[in-house]
């Protein structure tokens, strides 16, 4: 949950929205409550209670409240639309019990998720419009940033492009602050970090051997129902299996075999356009600078801070991934004892990220040098949520803002003239005092 704030008298302004606070909902996403819809609403109560404290009481009824659901709910809606509707109805009942101005809960499309993340990044980093010292807004000379988001069930890539997309489904045209933007965007469902980990787990089970991406010395009981319960992994499962059965699986710390297992997630052979990323999806060449956030950031941050490895180039990222995937379970625990629950999967996540960027999206060394891994801009998280809120509340106008922030130019001129007059008067007074001190009659 994110709470944003902005001055009430600057509603059509920009550069003024900031994140007031946030709250992490415990447990899984709302899609995990498909068989217990009421639990989805109950899971939000703790954060909603925090919102009651964080938002001033006299602003409760005037504060808009939105819920946007992403890839997890898109998957549920594909396979069990009735269950998805029940979950949304349950969270709606909970949200309407609070004094905020609830304005709806909906499932975002993959295109929406990608574009809203792109809007958030460029809004926060002032790529659309900047505020000058003389009280005027101006268009920055530099271009926009591309955005890459790696969520739990999907991953998105979005960037501005000069040429029309060969596949109209991958193009969005926006008009912001009087400027036109042609944006390429695509969301890959089942390529979010959580679903990738499940697909790799299913792939490891098919080999009847150890999991090459897990560290040697680590083992876990794997519930088959948990592995094959997703539409992303259903095709990898046996035709019949005991849903209550479990299998003991161990890791082997084999970087080369892990890379091979990850490569099976991508299809590079089919493309009906002039060029594709993977799975037959059109993508123009990546251009300009990019910001990579969410699980992209957390993976790189682990490699940098916990493993102490450089990742400034694609080659360094590959070497760092190989080093990580060669670690044993005891070695990893010694490095990060507080992250025991996440440690087994960092190798798989890093290997997938490297292949997605280099082979999937086509980043070479030159293009990769323009990628920044960042999860916040100031105190505000980078992600789709802020862009979604800005769109729903019309805080980004299509035309340039008519309002000026702070003191306008004419006021600056008057202040400068007054300052000059005071300074001149002070100089005249000092000169007179100096002359008086030098006169014969002076004491």
Model-flagged regions — what are they?
Residues 3, 22-60, 66, 72-147, ...:
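Helical "lid/coupling" subdomains associated with nucleotide-phosphate turnover
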Residues 8-19:
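Beta-propeller domains
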Residues 151:
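Active-site glycine-centered loops adjacent to acidic/histidine catalytic or metal-binding residues
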């Amino acid at each position: 949950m994110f709470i944003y704030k902005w001055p009430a008298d600057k509603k059509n302004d920009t550069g003024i929205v900031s994140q007031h606070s946030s709250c992490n909902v415990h447990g899984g996403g709302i899609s995990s409550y498909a068989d217990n819809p009421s639990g989805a609403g109950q899971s939000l109560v703790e954060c909603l209670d925090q919102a009651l404290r964080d938002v001033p009481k006299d602003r409760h009824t005037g504060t808009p409240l939105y819920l946007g659901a992403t890839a997890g709910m898109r998957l549920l809606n594909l396979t069990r639309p009735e269950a998805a509707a029940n979950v949304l109805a349950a969270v709606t009942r909970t949200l309407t019990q609070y004094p905020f101005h609830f304005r709806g809960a909906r499932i975002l499309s993959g295109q929406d998720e990608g574009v809203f993340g792109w809007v958030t990044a460029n809004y926060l980093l002032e790529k659309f419009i900047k505020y000058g010292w003389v009280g005027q807004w101006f268009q920055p000379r530099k271009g926009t940033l591309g955005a890459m988001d790696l969520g739990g069930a999907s991953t998105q890539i979005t960037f501005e492009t000069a040429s029309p997309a060969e596949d109209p489904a991958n193009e969005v045209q926006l008009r912001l602050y009087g400027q036109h933007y042609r944006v390429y965007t695509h969301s890959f469902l089942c390529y979010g970090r959580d679903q990738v980990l499940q697909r790799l787990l299913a792939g490891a089970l098919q080999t009847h051997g150890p999991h090459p991406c897990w560290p040697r010395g680590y083992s876990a009981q794997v519930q088959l129902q948990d592995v094959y319960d997703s539409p992303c992994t259903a095709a990898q499962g046996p035709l019949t299996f005991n849903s209550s059965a479990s299998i003991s699986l161990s890791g082997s710390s084999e970087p080369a075999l892990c890379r091979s297992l990850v490569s099976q997630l991508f299809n590079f052979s089919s493309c009906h356009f002039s060029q594709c990323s993977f799975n037959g999806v059109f993508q123009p060449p990546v251009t300009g600078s990019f910001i990579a956030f969410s699980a992209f950031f957390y993976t790189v941050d682990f490699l940098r801070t916990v493993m102490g490895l450089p990742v400034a180039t694609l080659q360094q990222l590959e070497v760092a991934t190989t080093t990580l995937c060669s670690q044993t379970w005891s070695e990893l625990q010694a490095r990060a004892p507080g992250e025991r629950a996440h440690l087994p999967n960092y190798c798989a996540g890093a290997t997938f990220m490297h292949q997605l960027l280099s082979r999937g999206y086509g980043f070479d060394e030159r293009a990769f040098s323009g990628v920044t891994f960042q999860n916040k801009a100031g105190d505000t998280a980078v992600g789709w949520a802020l862009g979604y809120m800005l769109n729903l509340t019309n805080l980004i106008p299509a035309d340039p803002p008519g309002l000026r922030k702070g003191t306008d130019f004419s006021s600056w001129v008057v202040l400068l003239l007054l300052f000059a007059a005071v300074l001149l008067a002070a100089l005249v007074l000092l000169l007179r005092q100096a002359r008086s001190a030098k006169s014969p009659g002076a004491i």
